[in-house]
Swiss-Prot record:
ATP binds at residues 11, 72-73, 102-105. Catalyzes the phosphorylation of D-fructose 6-phosphate to fructose 1,6-bisphosphate by ATP, the first committing step of glycolysis. This is ATP-dependent 6-phosphofructokinase 1. Optimum temperature is 85 degrees Celsius. PANTHER family: ATP-DEPENDENT 6-PHOSPHOFRUCTOKINASE (PTHR13697:SF4), PHOSPHOFRUCTOKINASE (PTHR13697). It catalyses: beta-D-fructose 6-phosphate + ATP = beta-D-fructose 1,6-bisphosphate + ADP + H(+). Its cofactor is Mg(2+). Its EC number is 2.7.1.11.
Length: 322
């Protein structure tokens, strides 16, 4: 294999640039050329491709976002669109791909493998941490720390005004961010999609906190934990609260910013491992880190098997929220 492509797709995640850097430099060490594909699958269809050398990826390890940009592509969802993308890859002389992204990215990559025989190795880049086959995904640690900093600041104003704050974090289908941020931030309640949320039970927890002398509380809500997110949950229990309550949606701030050391190291390790796997003949797999070791998981398994939250941590958070 003499020439490979690398692209980012779906939602951006801090550390993607560190992964791109690792792909390019590991490939260079193996004598393999790298072509950067801009704007994900949309750019692949349009042939938006640029050569990437070792100097092209200098000074990006600390940058958030992705220098290759990312986009969603409706056209790639069709067989005709994927055929166009494959034709562009062939025309560019690309013999294999490193796909950096989440489950949507990997589902698209699987189509290229199954329909056109294009070798693809995936690198897990998503703040949601919801991919099976890796303990952590690139961007998760940064998102947690970004959200935690915001919650620490909100707790200050919550205490000053003796209010309850319902804070919404990202996670439509997975509660990894909410759980880690909630536990680290000392939240009184953590609402995640993996567990049914009973508004009455939430109100009872907050009322019990008030009886114990608490004048302010934090409720961390994953966006998919309850219909309408944090605002929907507050609306369902507002009449039961004896204190003022506010909603804060952290939103896309969780995706941005300079990646943490942990994310930079993970991205560097997995980006390099993806190149080694691809050049070594692997395809249709995702590189991940499991118990400190690099592991390969079939892409199909990575997106279809459910990765569960640590329910022991959820129970611990309930014990500690006194």
């Amino acid at each position: 294999m003499k020439r490979i492509g690398v692209f980012t797709s779906g939602g951006d995640a801090p550390g993607m640039n560190a992964a791109i850097r690792a792909v390019v430099r590991q490939a260079h060490a193996l004598g393999v050329e790298v072509i950067g594909i801009r704007r994900g699958y949309a750019g692949m269809i349009q042939g938006e491709m640029v050569p990437l050398g070792v100097r092209d990826v200098a000074n990006i390890i600390q940058r958030g976002g992705t220098i290759l940009l990312t986009a969603r592509s409706q056209e790639f969802l069709t067989e005709e669109g994927r055929a166009k993308a494959y034709a562009k890859l062939q025309a560019a002389g690309i013999e294999g791909l490193v796909a950096i992204g989440g489950d949507g990215t990997f589902r698209g990559a699987l189509c290229l493998v199954e329909e056109h025989g294009m070798p693809v190795v995936g690198v897990p880049g998503t703040i949601d941490n919801d991919l099976y086959g890796t303990d952590y995904t690139i961007g998760f640690d940064t998102a947690v720390n970004t959200a935690l900093e915001a919650i620490d600041r909100i707790r200050d104003t919550a205490a000053s005004h003796e209010r309850v704050f319902f804070i919404e974090v990202m996670g439509r289908h997975a509660g990894f961010i909410a759980l880690d941020v909630g536990l680290a931030g000392g939240a009184e309640v953590i609402a995640v999609p993996e567990e049914p949320v009973d508004p009455k039970a939430v109100a009872e927890v907050l009322e019990a906190s008030q009886r114990r002398g608490k004048k302010s509380s934090i409720v961390v809500v994953a966006e998919g934990a309850y219909p309408g997110g944090a605002a929907g949950l507050l609306a369902a229990i507002r009449e039961h609260l004896q204190v003022e309550a506010r909603v804060t949606v952290l939103g896309h701030i969780q995706r941005g910013g300079s990646p943490t050391a942990k994310d930079r190291i993970l991205a560097s390790r997995l980006g390099a491992a993806a190149v080694e796997a691809l050049v070594g003949g692997a395809s249709g797999v995702m590189v991940g880190e499991v118990e400190g070791e690099v592991d390969l998981t079939p892409l199909k398994e990575a997106v279809e098997r459910r990765k569960d939250i640590n329910r022991a941590l959820l129970r611990l958070s309930q014990v500690l929220a006194l």
